[in-house]
Amino acid sequence: MTRARSYEIRTFGCQMNVHDSERLSGLLEDAGYVKAAPGATADLVVFNTCAVRENADNKLYGTLGHLAPVKAGRPGMQIAVGGCLAQKDRDTVVRKAPWVDVVFGTHNIGSLPVLLERARHNEQAQVEILESLEAFPSTLPAKRESAYAGWVSISVGCNNTCTFCIVPALRGKEVDRRPGDVLAEVQALVDQGVLEVTLLGQNVNSYGASFADPDEPRDRGAFAKLLRACGGIEGLERVRFTSPHPAEFTDDVIEAMAQTPNICPQLHMPLQSGSDRVLKAMRRSYRKARYLGIIEKVRAAMPHAAITTDIIVGFPGETEEDFQETLDVVRQARFTSAFTFQYSKRPGTPAAEMADQVPKQVVQERYDRLIALQEEISLAANRELIGTEVELLVAEGSGKKNAATARMSGRARDGRLVHFRPGGTAEPIRPGDLVTVDITEAAPHHLIADAPVKTHRRTRAGDAHERGITPKTAPIGVGLGLPRIGAPAPEPVAAGCSTGCGA
């Protein structure tokens, strides 16, 4: 008796990595693997890594160290390491963790099944890192994690040279997908019940400048056109995108957002610093006046838009005066929320070698002040919503609750997180359904709706979630000669264990 080999993917980092992991799942399941049950020891563990934070390598190698004795006691188990840290460290991974079987990079995720088979056959670690993109992620199958929301990549890579960021070195120059391929993937998700799609790119509003297809003409207005085209897809209720770059944010995108009903009134646009001097040192090709001007235009077109941002505190050379300028911009911008980061050196970036690194205790003190200011602003903005009605796409997982409330959670169209009490409906509310609720309480990072649910719309996404079904998208677009293999050799099942449980 034999059983299929099981797999587990552990993902670190950004939305790009989350989406890449969906592609890895699709590849592995097409090759005959099955997802390991929660808590079970998988035959294959894949790490999709991040290299952005300073301690990313410590986190990876610590986790690999914990797996070494597990693998030693489980014949046939394999470990693969991919993603940005693998692209950066290459042979270092196998040198530090010789029990790793496969190392692959950001440009060749489609080769993983082949590399796993080669490692099994040769009984030797396989390290394959390519310097340029082998295939768009869209040319690979994907096993989606959600029945109601999906990621769609519109580009890969980045042409910017921010001094704190290592991503362009690891993911390469920007390459854009054809609009028809993007829309075909969106349609494929909607056909399977997905209600919300997030368009992904390192810099989405430069889309159209670097099409991979030489027959596709360069088009600086392509992103606005893509947003409007998404508006024509029947059944697609919400469209989000991340992340735009302020230097290339154009009026036609604002107009498309305001005039296309299913584009969500939400904008996440990284600020990084409110000091023009620091922005110049970061090689961010905009200044605070331009940034605030974009926000002013967005709010004029969409008065209730939620605007969020990223801010780095303690960049090398940042003075107290520079930091005060950041606080001033935060006060003027009135962000709904902000992802704030204490600067940490990224090996391989120009900023890591800069003089005037800010002492840790100074960075921490500034960070605390920024957090306090932003929480004050967020709470004030959220309190203004008390008594208003919002539509929620119900999310998986329980909400902020106790035994009395039994709350569920959902996202409003503007992206705010709302915890609501689900009672009072004729049928049970499920993740993927849509409800309308009245806001009764506010906190800096979420809203509460404890009044009875006003409306409840059951959806195909809710049906799929209830049945435990998530979408699977087939390859879309032109492939680049990826090798294909069959299913891996099945594993013998241990006597008395019909489920393939781990030792």
Curated annotation (Swiss-Prot):
Residues 5-121 form the MTTase N-terminal domain. One of its GO terms (cellular component) is cytosol. It is found in: Cytoplasm. GO terms for molecular function: 4 iron, 4 sulfur cluster binding; metal ion binding; N6-isopentenyladenosine methylthiotransferase activity. [4Fe-4S] cluster 2 binds at residues 158, 162, 165. It catalyses: N(6)-dimethylallyladenosine(37) in tRNA + (sulfur carrier)-SH + AH2 + 2 S-adenosyl-L-methionine = 2-methylsulfanyl-N(6)-dimethylallyladenosine(37) in tRNA + (sulfur carrier)-H + 5'-deoxyadenosine + L-methionine + A + S-adenosyl-L-homocysteine + 2 H(+). Its main location: cytoplasm. Keywords: 4Fe-4S, Cytoplasm, Iron, Iron-sulfur, Metal-binding, S-adenosyl-L-methionine, Transferase, tRNA processing. Binds 2 [4Fe-4S] clusters. One cluster is coordinated with 3 cysteines and an exchangeable S-adenosyl-L-methionine. It holds the Pfam family UPF0004. Its cofactor is [4Fe-4S] cluster. Residues 144-380 form the Radical SAM core domain. Gene3D superfamilies: Methylthiotransferase, N-terminal domain, tm_1862 like domain. It is an enzyme of class 2 (transferase). Its EC number is 2.8.4.3. InterPro entries: Elp3/MiaA/NifB-like_rSAM, Methylthiotransferase, Methylthiotransferase_CS, Methylthiotransferase_N, Methylthiotransferase_N_sf, MiaB_methiolase, rSAM, rSAM_horseshoe. [4Fe-4S] cluster 1 binds at residues 14, 50, 84. Residues 383-453 form the TRAM domain. Belongs to the methylthiotransferase family. MiaB subfamily. Catalyzes the methylthiolation of N6-(dimethylallyl)adenosine (i(6)A), leading to the formation of 2-methylthio-N6-(dimethylallyl)adenosine (ms(2)i(6)A) at position 37 in tRNAs that read codons beginning with uridine. Monomer. HAMAP family: tRNA_metthiotr_MiaB. This is tRNA-2-methylthio-N(6)-dimethylallyladenosine synthase. It comes from Nocardia farcinica (strain IFM 10152).
